[in-house]
Structures are given as C-alpha cells and as structure tokens.
Amino acid sequence: MDLLVIGGSGLLGREIAAQARRAGAAVAATFHQRAAEVDGVDWRPLDIRSRPEVAELVRRIKPSTIVNAAFRQSDWTTTADGAMHVAAAAAEAGARLVHISSDAVFAGRAASYDEECPPDPVTPYGAAKAAAETAVKGLDRGAVIARTSLIIGGGASVHERHVHALASGAAAGVLFTDDVRCPVHVADLAAALLELAGSAYTGIHHVAGRDAVSRHELGRLIARRDGLSEAALPAGLRAGSGPPGALEVRLDCTVTQSRLTTRLRGAHEFLTPVSAR
C-alpha cells in the first residue's frame, strides 16, 4: 500500500485520498463512524484511541506513507494519545509519517510564528496538539509535522457552512473581527502535504494561506463568492466575550513555501468569485 490516511473521512482526509488516487497511488483510509465516498480507496474502520488497533492496522496494510489527519477538539485521547499511537506504529513499520498539527499550539502573543517558534498553547485543544507534536518528534525523528490553520474548500468546511447558516438566519451569533488566522484551501493543503510526504524533509513545517484575515472578513469573502448578503453577517469582538483562546495567530510559511512547488494561495485569491476571475 502506498498511502494510509488516518482520519480519511474528514474534509482534509478525503481531499488527500482523492488527490493521491488521481496520481495513481494505492490508498487506504480510516474512518471512525462512516466511510467517505472516494473512488478506489480501501476504507478501514479504526479507533485511533486504541494503540493495539492502530498497530495491527499498520502491520496489516504495510503502507509506505502515513498521513495522520485525525483529531477531535474536545478529546485529548484522540488528538494527543492517538497521534502517539500512529507515530509509534509508523516508526515500527518504517513508514514515512506526515502528522498534521495546528496553529492552536500558539497563544497569539507574537506578531507571527515561524517553524522555529516553540508552542505556547492557551486552550485544551492547543495543549493536546502540542503534546501530539512532542510525541511524534520523540517517536519518529524522520516525521514531518505540518501546522496549518483554518481549512476552507468546496463549501464543505465548518466555516463555510456556518456563514451560510448565519446569512440565511438558520443560526445566531457573530463573526469575530479580532480573531485572525491564515486560512488555507483544502486542495492546496492536501497537495502540499503529499509533496512533503514525497520529499526528504523532516520536522516542523508551516502550511497555511498567505493572507491573515479575521473571521468576519473570511465570512464576507465566502458570502461574496457564494452570492450571499455580506450585510447579513453580524460582526462582534471575541475579546472579553467570546470563547477563550488566542486572538491573532499568523503562521509564517516562508520557509516551507520555498521548499514546495505547490503554491499556498491566500483567502482573497481562492475565495474570489468565479465571475471575477
């Protein structure tokens, strides 16, 4: 087997599997509750929280490369322990590992964060992601750890669905003007991860879009692309009223982008309406 995608039924996992299949790779992917519809993929159920189950699957499939896209924001065992289980199995099997991490490992106190910046999480999810990175580095020194940001694409992301719900009145709430990230298109991210998987690079890489935008600005871009009313998207401040966490986290992807042929577009580019291109 060329590639095993852990967490293959999610937005990113599906895109990785689909791109790898189009490139001619033999692909297996795991799901926890329901398999996705990606032609030619060998779907396997997996509870990543079980170390023996992960080890047995990797021994059975014998993948050359493993991409771990599995996480659950509210579950330390899935996000942190699961990553440890995958890294241990990859190291034992001699498989190339690409572990997907998050900008949630940062507190947002710095103007920007490059690959040399140490994690300083301020949320349980960020702490779980930071712990996962530590486990991967300790168990598999040849692994790639790819930190990314908000993932957008094809109308299927949480952020896109939320914008549509707000615009239609199906959901209440606001989009924060002081919560800034570097959104990335799922197709760009998947291509970059597969490129890193096929390279000799190891260690931390930042893989996000080039534009730093607020949640509200991102919502307006999505609305503009999809022909929704931008005026229907309420704006608000996260500071002092929203959920705890970092406000502004800008990933500096300069080093990683210099190593890739895949171009990491910014939100202003990949969310441009088709009619305006």
Question: Residue ranges of each PLM-predicted region?
Answer:
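NAD(P)H-binding glycine-rich loop region in Rossmannoid oxidoreductase-like domains
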Residues: 42-85, 89-91
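Alpha-helical substrate-binding/gating segment
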Residues: 163-172, 180-207
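Conserved C-terminal active-site "lid" loop/helix of NAD(P)H-dependent oxidoreductases
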Residues: 214-220, 235-277
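N-terminal Rossmann-fold cofactor-binding loop
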Residues: 29-37, 48
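NAD(P)-dependent short-chain dehydrogenase/reductase
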Residues: 134-181
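Mid/C-terminal beta-alpha module of Rossmann-like enzyme folds, strongest
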Residues: 190-192, 198-243
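N-terminal Rossmann NAD(P)H-binding glycine-rich loop of SDR-like oxidoreductase domains
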Residues: 1-23
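Catalytic helix-loop patch of NAD(P)-dependent Rossmann-fold dehydrogenases
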Residues: 105-146, 150-152
